[in-house]
Amino acid sequence: MTPEQCEFIAGNEWIQINPQFNLDELHLICGDIGPFEAGMPIWVPLWIAVTLRKRRKCTIIPPQWLCVEELKKLVIAESGTNAFGQVPRFYLEIAHMFVQYAKEDLPDSDMIRVYVQDLWDKRSAKLNNSSTKFLGQVESCHARMDNITLMEVAYIKRSLITASREIEALNKSFHELSSQNSSDQRYVIA
């Protein structure tokens, strides 16, 4: 899965907007949305919010966690443990879409960008460390990681698969050499 695919999936998350127009209910595959009344907050999928925002038909109301204070708490919590802290689902994708399409609707957008990047850096470092430890294990062939997001899985997936294949090839070569050495020793003894 690519970051773009993760962002596409995140587009189905529901978020509040303040529409700047009036419109009856919309009947979409994902469900009915509306009616829209100018100035009255309404919940819509993020992809609709972004589309309306691009056309300047609404302002997007940031989720409660997308503010400096809450992000600061998440960064501090993430720093305080080796385990992955619980973060909002699609935090990176939603923050990215806000900064890209609705920066004006996001108070302190520059500081928010810094805290989201800091949170990502801390979590990706943990992912890399966890992956290294996992790949260094001889006996175990599975791992459990709690509280990681889809984007983080996409980030680490390719390198884990590549490294696992390399380790498998090395193990195969090692076993072939070991069996060849043991057969060579039989000829010497006999």
Swiss-Prot record:
Pfam families: PSF2_N (PF25005), Sld5 (PF05916)
Assigned keywords, A-Z: DNA replication, Nucleus
Subcellular location: Nucleus
BP-aspect Gene Ontology terms: DNA replication; double-strand break repair via break-induced replication
Paired cysteines (S-S): none
Nucleus listed as a keyword: yes
UniProt KW Phosphoprotein keyword: no
One GO CC annotation: GINS complex
Residues in coiled coil: none
SUBUNIT field: Component of the GINS complex which is a heterotetramer of gins1, gins2, gins3 and gins4.
PANTHER family: DNA REPLICATION COMPLEX GINS PROTEIN PSF2
Role according to the record: The GINS complex plays an essential role in the initiation of DNA replication.
Family indicated by similarity: Belongs to the GINS2/PSF2 family.
Protein name (record): Probable DNA replication complex GINS protein PSF2
